[in-house]
């Protein structure tokens, strides 16, 4: 009883506790200034105290709100009238509520609102009228609600909303119009545009959906396009004509117009609308015809018809009504008036006159100025001046003239220009004590004055603030109290323009570690977190490095925002020292820790499946490879993908064996993984499987052995120091004598950043959702089609097309990824082209989005690059799972490997054995010049000879020479350059044998390639900024790995694709088009026969240096030749080069673009607007946002291509960083770099620096006689071209060996690295050595052999010297004695015909033995050669491995599956 009594007492007290002296309405609750009258069945507005601030009348039966119902409640800020029965709100119902903020009218029965309903509610912020019966609104209804932030009109019956209904609601933040019956026709288009503007600027949330028409039902109004609104602005179909009428007659002016909605016809007389109500003589018919009855003299003048609807308006030409009377001189009906007009707008000086006959109107300007006929147009109603400029300022005179007289009237055009900013300041963040300078400039008429304010007031009197006469605000030494908002104002009599900027002043703070990482250990297969935190100003970015390679986000590694490194599924490769780097714009701090990975003893889950999985993997991989070979080489290719696969398929058996072993190794792990998952009782679907706890290290080593990974080529033998001190090995080994495989062919690409695979090991980005992302990566084909546009090519104003083609030629010297050996999936052998599943090696590109080619295929063929065994590490044992790496077939160095091959086997195939002069093989001579073409390849001709009349492929150091006519021409040029060099060197040194000539010529050609690249080509690409970053040569650094970086080969160096022109120009000697014409890019592919049949190499080369390059415009990055028509000359389905590059980057685990920005010390990226410094075009950033969703997912290549070019370069900031990094490594890590002291003599180096591509063209073109000095620079023909005789040459005389009597002939000694003391037989092949040694014994006694040892001999003629003969003879005798000793040693070595194997066991000549179960070895010519046996598919379902046999055994017969009895 007591609690109930207390409650009633409390309510009573509340009811009475209102404002002193003012009554609380009966049954209402009052508390201070709040009055609540709810659930009282009220049917009227009660009287409440005047000081009320909150009035709550909800849940009553109020039906009407009368006028001035709340007039005395000046303090009311909240009025709740919802949940009543209100049907009518009188005009001025809310009069006097100037302070009302919140008005609730929802859930009533309101059908209409008067346009004065909300008049005076100037402070209202929230208005809720939803859930009513509103059927229409008036444009002025919300006109006074300037501060309104929320307007809820949903769940009414609105079908139409008049234009301009929300035009004054500048503070609006939320607008709801959904759940109405909106008809989305032309009348509602204004609302769609308004809502689209809300969405674009982001300051207002709005909702509105279409109910009608049916086709738009449920669509958001903001999403409806202009075309879908089906609007048609008025179009005049019949215009009124001039008429002359006597007094009292009736006149008809006809006007017809069409439009949707039907336009309203309005008539204008002498620039004033006709008022039909005031003059009963006037009438407008339904068809728009104007009738004037009982005409008067006042009716004469100009009539104009205007048709208007919601989509726009249209006016007819003026029609004249002339009142017929007695002859009269002219008199003005309308005179021109002085007009003030803003610059850039248009205006009309109206001038019309009457008279009889009708007067002629003409115009003149004061001061004798003529009218501008292009902008000043005389019409029947006046003078129309369009696009007003400052020159239009002045006086214009209208002349009306007839036979009875002339009248004139003049008016002034006063041109005014309000202030407009020409330079606007930007927000700045600076360190204290740094200077700040804001530029602010404006134009206008009258000229505006620049005024600066701070936080709305004057600039501080104290401090270092200075406003220059130009309007620039300068703060000399910024301090903390200087930060805040500044405003630049451009002030003139026409108005004020303002722009605000924010200054943030931060104290200096370098990065400092707040938590250091500690040495720790982790078990194999476990995850581990390593903390590293730092602070600074700005907040430093934390990155982690391992062994000099930056760690990036992937399925293997994760670095959170605070800097903690997480390593998933730790393995032995993860052991080592890690660096934590804290970097901000003022510096960096580095600390490190050591991670130890400990092994888990015992068997792993996958060990039981090793034997069966390896057998299945061998069978599946071999079967798929054999199937692919049959498909590619037993017939001509059917598709462009077949052509590409055949063209790039490895020819070298060693490459095939290495790639096969890598595929077997990976596929075995995949099979084990699948079988372990099948045996688990826990469902792991959707979770990444962990590799390092899959199988034990012992089982991994077994898999590596059985797959062939450990049977790779032996480590290079660099013991022959005499050869390796002077010449390069063809395969690039032994360049770095401490790390012999650095930069060598058939090694894994290098990395700047750790690979970004989805599972951390092998799964590419693009399979499923990216790590930490909410949406999948866009299909590469979609990305490519966004950037590919068919547009006119913009020519480069500085450079020629040779710039791109030299890069293409150079790229083939540096890298060539080993492709997939199979284009059929391993699981069931089905071709990748017939399935669209990500089943190794298939990694197809989805094309389900709209494809411009119109193909219905759901995907495009793509097969992953072949993996390197154990990431290409040279270790003989494999005890852990490494991240997938790819193999580079080429040597990394700029050494002409695309001319000479990247292996000893290739180089031998290219040399001409018939001529012992160190020449390369030649093809038949080109008839006009007699210079040879490249020889034809003896392999399968199907890539090039697709038709019987076509020639086979050319034979060159790189098979890709046949890929394009320009490449074939460049290869022809350089093979001729070698033979030219070899011929001249042989003539200068007739005592040199063939191999010495070959090696010396090869060495010179390599130096020319280096010099042209770094001195002529790179400065054009990198400009002065990049050249400074690259810095000058400082000597060889053996600690630099010159290997090609994966991201450089896969993405950065593919920048040339954006420079490819869709047309290959072919020019004659005067740079005109040849008779055979130019070629589309795709028709120049795989067509070397065009060189033979259509003019040789000169027309192609002239098209490279005689035509401007393509300018890289972000709006037209790629030609459709590359994305839609590549290889379509021969096949119906083309290949998309751009999409392939993007997919290849994901295949290779190339990290996203933002990770490389961090590596290159650019600003970090959290959202797309953070890219505005490097990608200024907002439209491009919007495209990236639409494609990727998150900046952290952007692929490297497309981002590099859309970066803004650094002025004076052809690259953006990140691409510049990658270029400089790679080319520094290529130069500094090359022991044979041409500028490295000792590689060439100073005299030779001086001559090599005379080399130029222009000279090479002159010397080796078919018949090129004129060329510009620098073929990369655009030049005008003929004035900027030089005769070839004016181009500097490399003088080879400094390579001439000097004889013993050179001093008497006045000659000088000049031989590469003292080669005059070394016998060239050491660098010979076996045939050359045998020939040289046999000659050695039969030399006549009058010859003398001088040298350091028996392997280095130079033949000198015996002569007598007139001076110092005794000393010379003593030296000769001493040398002969040493020579005999060396000859005896050589002969003893030649008599030893045996070998020594890797275990130190002596072997006899021709002896054969088994090194391992699958490895056969033989001793031949003193050298051990081992071959790994390839097993055929087993004919039984469950073959087994038996110790002592190589291939699986079928138990049912107890014999190997490949034994002859089973065939």
From Swiss-Prot:
Site residues (Transition state stabilizer), renumbered to this chain: 960
Binding-site residues for heme b, renumbered to this chain: 1057
Enzyme class: oxidoreductase
Residues annotated as domain Ig-like C2-type: 234-322, 330-414, 419-504, 507-596
LRR repeats: 51-72, 75-96, 99-120, 123-144, 147-168
GO MF assignments: endonuclease activity; heme binding; lactoperoxidase activity; metal ion binding; peroxidase activity
SUPFAM superfamilies documented for this protein: FnI-like domain (SSF57603), Heme-dependent peroxidases (SSF48113), Immunoglobulin (SSF48726), L domain-like (SSF52058)
Documented EC number(s): 1.-.-.-
Gene induction: Increased by Angiotensin-2.
Stored CDD domains: peroxidasin_like
Gene3D superfamilies for the chain: 6.20.200.20, Haem peroxidase domain superfamily, animal type, Immunoglobulins, Ribonuclease Inhibitor
Domain VWFC: 1393-1451
Keywords, alphabetical: Calcium, Cell membrane, Cytoplasm, Disulfide bond, Endonuclease, Endoplasmic reticulum, Glycoprotein, Heme, Hydrolase, Immunoglobulin domain, Iron, Leucine-rich repeat, Membrane, Metal-binding, Nuclease, Oxidoreductase, Phosphoprotein, Repeat, Secreted, Signal
Function: Probable oxidoreductase. Lacks peroxidase activity. Inhibits the peroxidase activity of PXDN through its interaction.
Name assigned to this protein: Probable oxidoreductase PXDNL
Organism: Homo sapiens (Human)
């Amino acid at each position: 009883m007591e609690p109930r009594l207390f409650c009633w007492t409390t309510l009573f007290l509340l009811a009475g506790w209102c404002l002193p002296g003012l009554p609380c309405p009966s049954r209402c609750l009052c508390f201070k200034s709040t009055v609540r009258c709810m659930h009282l069945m009220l049917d009227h507005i009660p009287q409440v105290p005047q000081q009320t601030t909150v009035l709550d009348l909800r849940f009553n039966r109020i039906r009407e709100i009368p006028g001035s119902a709340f007039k005395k409640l000046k303090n009311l800020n909240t009025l709740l009238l919802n949940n009543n029965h209100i049907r009518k709100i009188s005009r001025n119902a809310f009069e006097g509520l100037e302070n009302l903020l919140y008005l609730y009218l929802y859930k009533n029965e309101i059908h209409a609102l008067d346009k004065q309903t909300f008049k005076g509610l100037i402070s209202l912020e929230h208005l809720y009228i939803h859930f009513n019966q509103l059927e229409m609104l008036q444009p002025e209804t919300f006109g006074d609600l300037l501060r309104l932030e929320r307007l809820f009109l949903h769940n009414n019956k609105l079908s139409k909303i008049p234009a301009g209904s929300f035009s004054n609601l500048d503070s609006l933040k939320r607008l709801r119009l959904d759940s109405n019956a909106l008809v989305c026709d032309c009348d509602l288009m204004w609302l769609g545009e308004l809502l689209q503007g809300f969405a674009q600027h982001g300051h207002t949330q709005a909702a509105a959906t279409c109910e009608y028409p049916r086709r738009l039902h449920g669509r958001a109004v903001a999403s409806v396009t202009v075309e879908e609104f089906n609007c048609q602005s008025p179009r005049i179909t019949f215009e009124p004509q001039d008429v002359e009428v006597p007094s009292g007659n009736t006149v008809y002016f006809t006007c017809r117009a069409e439009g949707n909605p039907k336009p309203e016809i309005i008539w204008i007389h002498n620039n004033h609308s006709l008022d039909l109500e005031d003059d009963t003589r006037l009438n407008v018919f339904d068809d728009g015809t104007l009738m004037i009855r009982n005409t008067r003299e006042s009716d004469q003048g100009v009539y104009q018809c205007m048709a208007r609807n919601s989509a726009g308006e249209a006016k007819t030409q003026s029609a004249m009504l002339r009142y017929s009377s007695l002859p009269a001189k002219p008199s003005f009906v309308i005179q021109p008036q002085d007009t003030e007009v803003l610059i850039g707008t248009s205006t009309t000086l109206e001038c019309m006159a009457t008279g009889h006959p009708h007067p002629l109107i003409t115009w003149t300007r004061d001061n004798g100025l003529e009218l501008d006929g292009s902008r000043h147009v005389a019409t029947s109603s006046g003078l129309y001046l369009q696009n007003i400029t400052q020159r239009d300022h002045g006086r214009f005179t209208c002349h009306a003239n007839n036979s009875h007289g002339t009248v004139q009237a003049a008016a002034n055009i006063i041109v005014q220009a309000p202030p407009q900013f020409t330079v606007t300041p930007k927000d700045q963040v600076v360190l204290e004590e740094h200077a700040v300078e804001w530029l602010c400039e404006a134009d206008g008429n009258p000229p505006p004055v620049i005024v600066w304010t701070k936080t709305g007031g004057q600039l501080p009197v104290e401090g270092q603030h200075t406003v220059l006469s130009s309007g620039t605000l300068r703060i000399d030494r910024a301090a903390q109290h200087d930060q805040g908002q500044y405003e630049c104002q451009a002030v003139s009599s026409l108005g004020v323009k303002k722009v605000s900027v924010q200054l943030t002043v931060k104290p200096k703070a370098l990065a400092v570690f707040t938590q250091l990482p500690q040495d720790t250990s982790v078990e194999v297969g476990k995850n581990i977190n390593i903390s590293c935190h730092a602070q600074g100003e700005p907040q430093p970015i934390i990155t982690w490095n391992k062994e000099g390679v930056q760690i990036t986000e992937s399925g293997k590694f994760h670095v959170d925002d605070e800097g903690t490194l997480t390593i998933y599924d730790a393995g032995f490769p993860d052991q080592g020292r890690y660096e934590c780097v804290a970097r901000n714009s003022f510096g960096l701090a580095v600390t490190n820790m050591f991670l130890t990975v400990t092994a888990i003893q015992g068997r792993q889950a996958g060990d039981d499946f090793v034997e069966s999985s390896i057998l299945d993997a061998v069978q599946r991989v071999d079967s798929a490879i054999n199937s692919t070979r049959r498909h590619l080489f037993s017939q001509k290719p059917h598709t462009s993908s077949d052509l590409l696969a055949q063209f790039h398929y490895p020819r070298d058996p060693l490459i095939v064996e290495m790639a096969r072993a890598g595929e077997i190794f990976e596929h075995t792990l995949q099979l084990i993984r699948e079988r372990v998952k099948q045996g688990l009782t826990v469902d792991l679907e959707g979770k990444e499987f962990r590799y390092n706890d899959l199988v034990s290290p012992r089982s991994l080593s077994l898999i590596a052995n059985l797959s062939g990974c450990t049977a790779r080529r032996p480590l290079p033998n660099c013991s022959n120091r005499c050869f390796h001190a002077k010449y390069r090995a063809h395969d690039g080994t032994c360049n770095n004598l401490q790390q012999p495989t650095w930069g060598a062919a058939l090694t894994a690409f290098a990395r700047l950043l750790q690979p970004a695979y989805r599972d951390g090991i092998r799964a590419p980005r693009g399979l499923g959702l990216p790590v930490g992302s909410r949406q999948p990566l866009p299909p590469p084909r979609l990305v490519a089609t966004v950037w590919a546009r068919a547009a006119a090519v913009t020519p480069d104003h500085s450079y020629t097309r040779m710039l791109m083609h030299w890069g293409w030629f150079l790229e083939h010297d540096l890298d060539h990824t080993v492709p997939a050996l199979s284009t059929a999936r391993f699981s069931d052998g089905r071709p990748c082209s017939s399935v669209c599943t990500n089943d190794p090696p298939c990694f197809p590109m989805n094309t389900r989005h709209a494809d411009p080619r119109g193909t219905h295929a759901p995907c495009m063929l793509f097969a992953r690059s072949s993996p390197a065994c154990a990431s290409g590490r040279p270790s003989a044992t494999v005890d852990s799972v490494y991240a997938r790496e790819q193999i580079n077939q080429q040597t990394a160095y700029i050494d002409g490997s695309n001319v000479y091959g990247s292996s000893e086997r290739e180089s031998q195939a290219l040399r001409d054995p018939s001529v012992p002069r160190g020449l390369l093989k030649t093809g038949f001579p080109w008839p006009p010049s007699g210079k040879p073409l490249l020889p034809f390849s003896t392999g399968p001709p199907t890539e090039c000879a697709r038709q019987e009349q076509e020639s086979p492929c050319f034979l060159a150091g790189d098979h890709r020479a046949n890929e394009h006519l320009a490449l074939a021409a460049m290869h022809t040029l350089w093979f001729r350059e070698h033979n030219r060099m070899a011929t001249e060197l042989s003539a200068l040194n007739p005592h040199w044998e063939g191999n010495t000539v070959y090696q010396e010529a090869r060495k010179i050609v390599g130096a020319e390639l280096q010099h042209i690249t770094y001195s002529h080509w790179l400065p054009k690409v990198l400009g002065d900024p990049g050249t400074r970053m690259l810095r000058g040569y400082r000597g060889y650094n053996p600690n630099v790995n010159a290997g090609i970086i994966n991201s450089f080969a896969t993405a950065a160096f593919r920048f040339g694709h954006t420079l490819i022109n869709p047309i290959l120009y072919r020019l004659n000697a005067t740079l005109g088009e040849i008779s055979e014409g130019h070629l589309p890019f795709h028709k120049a592919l795989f067509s070397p026969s065009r060189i033979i049949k259509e003019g040789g190499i000169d027309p192609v080369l002239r098209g490279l240096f005689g035509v401007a390059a393509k300018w890289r415009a972000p709006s037209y990055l790629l030609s459709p030749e590359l994305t839609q028509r590549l290889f379509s000359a021969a096949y119906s389905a083309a290949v998309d080069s751009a999409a392939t590059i993007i997919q290849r980057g994901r295949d290779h685990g190339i990290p996203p673009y933002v990770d490389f920005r961090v590596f290159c010390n650019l600003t970090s990226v959290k959202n797309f607007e953070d890219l505005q410094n490097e990608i200024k075009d907002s439209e491009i950033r919007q495209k990236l946002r639409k494609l990727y969703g998150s900046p952290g997912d952007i692929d490297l290549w497309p981002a590099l291509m859309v970066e803004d070019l650094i002025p004076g370069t052809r690259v953006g900031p990140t691409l510049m960083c990658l270029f400089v990094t790679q080319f520094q490594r290529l130069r500094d890590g090359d022991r044979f770099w041409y500028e490295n002291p000792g590689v060439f003599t100073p005299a030779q180096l001086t001559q090599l620096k005379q080399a130029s591509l222009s000279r090479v063209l002159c010397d080796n073109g078919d018949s090129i006689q004129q060329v510009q000095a620098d073929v990369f620079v655009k030049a005008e023909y003929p004035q900027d071209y030089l005769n070839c005789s004016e181009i500097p040459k490399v003088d080879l005389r400094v390579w001439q060996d000097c004889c013993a009597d050179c001093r008497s002939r006045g000659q000088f000694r000049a031989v590469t690295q003292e080669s005059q003391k070394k016998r060239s037989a050491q660098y010979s092949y076996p045939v050359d050595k045998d020939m040289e040694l046999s000659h050695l014994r039969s030399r006549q006694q009058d010859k003398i052999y001088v040298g350091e040892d028996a392997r280095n001999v130079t033949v000198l003629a015996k002569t007598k010297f007139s001076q110092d003969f005794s000393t010379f003879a003593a030296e000769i005798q001493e040398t002969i004695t040493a020579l005999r000793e060396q000859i005896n040693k050589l002969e003893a070595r030649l008599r030893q015909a045996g070998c020594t194997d890797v275990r130190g066991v002596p072997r006899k000549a021709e002896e054969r033995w088994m090194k391992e179960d699958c490895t056969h070895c033989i001793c031949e010519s003193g050298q051990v050669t081992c071959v790994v046996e390839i097993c055929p598919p087993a004919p039984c379902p469950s073959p087994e491995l038996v110790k002592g046999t190589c291939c699986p055994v079928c138990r049912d017969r107890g014999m190997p599956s490949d034994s002859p009895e089973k065939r």
